[in-house]
Amino acid sequence: MFRKIITYLTIYSFMFSNVCWAAMITPDGRTQTTVNVNGHVYDVTTSTVSGKNAFNSFSNFDVYKGTTVNLYLPGSTLNLINLVRDGKTNIDGILNSIKNGKIGGNVFILNPHGIAIGKSGVVNVGSLMLSTPNKEFMDQVIGQDGSISELATKSVLAGDLPINPAGVISVKGKIKALDSVAVRAGGVVNAGEILANLKPTQASDIVNTGGLDIDAPLAFKDGKIGVFAENDVVNAGTIKADA
């Protein structure tokens, strides 16, 4: 009997653990997003594309400590726009953006509830924009029926979006971008490392040259770092764009 109880507890623990890990990333059905899991590695792909822009829409998006999440840019896309709707995003593991089999691409993560990169969190990208837009704008970008707004997408790419003043972006870990980093939120707290321009950049690699054409005044230009907040910006860490 005692042995049976132990067996039941082991099975329950295994099943409960799997449910918890599965809840880490939850697509909401507005985009054709697929999450493939191999151990503690999560590969996230999408076939929702408009011009040079690919889209993921999630109910929840977290990266647990000890896990690696790879966000893939499909085909010839340059920009990957990720919308998270139902809860704060916590990144405590490794988050990579993959373009043509290596780190690259322009990655946007939009979450009205805030984004936190913990001490063990590392983000490796081509370029990155983190923002906390309001919920109304999120619904404009991709509607409940999956329709994509060209006008709202242009605003995302330009970094010109209405911000939720209660949304906070905090960095205690590391952001490592080959090109640029832009942060727009209600409040920003950096106690980690935000590193950009980690290799020489070529304009043709980072400017959207098809689909929705913009000049990218804020994000993804010249290996710079831009941090903007409706309220306070607190920097107790490192913000550095290598020459």
How would you describe each model-predicted region?
Residues M1-L9:
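Bacterial N-terminal signal peptides that target proteins for export
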Residues V19-A243:
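Solvent-exposed adhesion/ligand-recognition segments of exported proteins
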Residues Y8-S17:
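Bacterial N-terminal signal peptides
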